[in-house]
């Protein structure tokens, strides 16, 4: 269990807000390779914000690849006026790579879930990449990515060494997204 509302021992600079929820902008102390995790999140109600400004955050797997968190409930063509990443930027999208198969967002202030299965990239003894990382994501119980093969780079970021394990990072994007019931099982 990484977070059950009682303490932030598993997190770097983790903070509990409203007496029971984990605040955005923290990462796990432990680093992970192959794993499965579950988390619940809640986006704020921001009725005057447009597009990606509505409850924007993200969950970074291995501190590299971002699973988008945003209030995309009711997302429609109107949102494309405000965002260049309007497809990828929906909740559950893999940032700048692929949008979710279906928009499974609940309204803001509702608790939502991500259940994620992640398989790290594989390398031979010489350090040559043999197989890319792969991810499966369920948003609110519905599969939105099925064994998606992740490219060898993280869009918009400096090159990374995929051989390293990494933390789970809950992005600080200056929006008050909160989390609860976070657990992870290494595989």
Where do the model's predicted regions map?
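Carbohydrate-interacting regions of secretory-pathway proteins
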Residues: 1-187
């Amino acid at each position: 269990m990484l977070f059950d509302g009682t303490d932030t021992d598993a997190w770097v600079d983790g903070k509990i807000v409203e007496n029971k929820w984990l605040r955005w902008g923290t990462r796990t102390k432990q680093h992970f390779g192959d794993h499965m995790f579950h988390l619940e999140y809640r986006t704020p109600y921001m009725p005057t914000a447009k597009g990606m400004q509505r409850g924007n955050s993200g969950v970074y797997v291995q501190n590299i690849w971002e699973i988008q968190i945003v209030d995309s409930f009711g997302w429609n063509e109107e949102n494309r006026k405000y965002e260049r990443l309007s497809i990828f930027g929906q909740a559950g999208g893999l940032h700048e790579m692929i949008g979710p198969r279906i928009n499974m967002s609940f309204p803001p202030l509702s608790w939502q879930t991500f259940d994620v299965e992640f398989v790290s990239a594989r390398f031979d003894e010489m350090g040559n990449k043999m197989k890319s990382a792969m991810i499966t994501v369920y948003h609110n119980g519905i599969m939105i990515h099925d064994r998606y093969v992740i490219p060898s780079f993280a869009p918009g970021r400096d090159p990374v060494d995929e051989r390293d394990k990494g933390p789970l990072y809950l992005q600080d994007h200056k929006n008050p997204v909160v989390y609860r019931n976070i657990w992870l099982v290494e595989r």
